[in-house]
């Protein structure tokens, strides 16, 4: 699965999302639940704004010194017996991974949850070589066996499915014969996946944070699949975005606490795993060979720009869990594996405006996302910067919008034209008026009035009213 999901146009995806009543209900319920948990976890920690500021400082410091910490990380991984590969593009990353798998004669691969591997289309690349790649995160596994259904949420990828749908998928694909009770579904998936773990040649993981001064990589999970992926297969490959790094375990401790509280409202998740290189002599478990693939794929182009702060993201999805737009249209409407406010900022930067020019406009600019972000990314401001760039630098504004803005600018710059326009506006809008409102507007108003009414121009103009008042009081002009 690549970063882009589906071939539908943005408006079609949004329409499908609005029509999906179950999805909207599930998203609304999940948002309320996760938001309440996050607020309670923040209250329990105390001094939440100070913790946010500290987390922001850590992420800013890393980005400003990223070359130093990446070099330190690579050196320490190599010292511990691991291999490091810097991939500038998605193709370079998948090419290296495919080469490692071929050299190890790997055919069966187990994988823990990783957004960056989906971004670079890794699964499809390995499957084209005849490998079996099995997602072991339960949500990702459900989506994979359901014809590679794309994720709709960064933390809860199968949020858009209910238990009855999951039951039917299990019955059709993995021989399930029981009810839709979650515990029965989980037990069946566990039995199927346990066999996959034991048969695997290669384990592939993502990385929540890499620790530069020890050469370690960390996994934050609630299911324990990450530990099985990293301890049973003989070869482990970890894939990380180049920005997902901290100087030491001191900074890691701060960020992982902010991550778990912001994502699911927990003090800590069930499993926090730090792995440092391949198995050493005398150790009971762990891989015999370890590879770390550090992916750029457009991230270096963001460094040093007005959008650099988006790379502070720790993938907690707190912004998604408070977004009113996501609440109504769901994750698939964004057309990217990165949904919600963070996706609306990041996807155009990594994937370009050709595919994602609408996303910066998929926002009410209420700033709830910026307030929720544990590392203080000013998401609503970045969305505005995107809009400005789209119009001024990219020249991608619709022709109708350009003409409307030019007409408005011309009219408001000349008092005589403004006076004439305000005088004739009520008559011009009369054919579209119904019960004092415009219900089916022309031109640029058409899309607006498809879903809401537009106030009709009033025959009584403010300037006339004001002038009459002045005359009544005998005031001079």
Curated annotation (Swiss-Prot):
Domain 4Fe-4S ferredoxin-type: 304-334, 353-382
Family matches, as PROSITE patterns: 4FE4S_FER_1 (PS00198)
Listed Basic and acidic residues bias regions: 461-477
Domain of life from the UniProt record: Bacteria
Binding site for [4Fe-4S] cluster 1: 313, 316, 319, 373
Gene3D superfamilies reported for this sequence: Alpha-helical ferredoxin (1.10.1060.10), NagB/RpiA/CoA transferase-like (3.40.50.10420)
Example of a GO MF term: 4 iron, 4 sulfur cluster binding
InterPro entries for the chain: 4Fe4S_Fe-S-bd, 4Fe4S_Fe_S_CS, FTHF_cligase-like_sf, Helical_ferredxn, LUD_dom, LutB, LutB/LldF, LutB_C
Keywords recorded for this protein, A-Z: 4Fe-4S, Electron transport, Iron, Iron-sulfur, Metal-binding, Repeat, Transport
Region (Disordered): 433-477
Gene Ontology terms describing biological process: lactate metabolic process
Binding site for [4Fe-4S] cluster 2: 323, 366, 369
Function: Is involved in L-lactate degradation and allows cells to grow with lactate as the sole carbon source. Has probably a role as an electron transporter during oxidation of L-lactate.
Similarity comment: family membership: Belongs to the LutB/YkgF family.
Protein's name according to its UniProt entry: Lactate utilization protein B
Taxonomic lineage from the root: Bacteria, Bacillati, Bacillota, Bacilli, Bacillales
